[in-house]
């Protein structure tokens, strides 16, 4: 599970 990848995806969606 890519935690950093998920965070970056959410940050980019904001």
UniProtKB/Swiss-Prot annotation:
- Source taxon at top rank: Eukaryota
* Keyword Manganese set for record: no
Q: What is its main location?
A: secreted
Entry comment describing in which tissues the protein is expressed: Expressed by the venom gland.
> A GO molecular-function term, please?
toxin activity
A GO BP term here is: killing of cells of another organism
Q: According to the UniProt entry, which residues carry Leucine amide? A: 14
Q: Name one GO cellular component term.
A: membrane
**UniProt keyword terms in alphabetical order:** Amidation, Antibiotic, Antimicrobial, Cytolysis, Fungicide, G-protein coupled receptor impairing toxin, Immunity, Innate immunity, Mast cell degranulation, Membrane, Secreted, Target cell membrane, Target membrane, Toxin
Where does the UniProt annotation locate this protein? Secreted; Target cell membrane
Per the record, the similarity remark reads: Belongs to the MCD family. Mastoparan subfamily.
Role this protein plays: Linear cationic alpha-helical peptide with antimicrobial activities against both Gram-positive and Gram-negative strains and against the yeast C.albicans. Shows moderate mast cell degranulation and leishmanicidal activities. Has a very low hemolytic activity. Its mast cell degranulation activity may be related to the activation of G-protein coupled receptors in mast cells as well as interaction with other proteins located in cell endosomal membranes in the mast cells.
Task: Return the protein name.
Answer: Eumenine mastoparan-ER
Tell me which species this is from.
Answer: Eumenes rubrofemoratus
């Amino acid at each position: 599970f890519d935690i950093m990848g998920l965070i970056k995806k959410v940050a980019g969606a904001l």
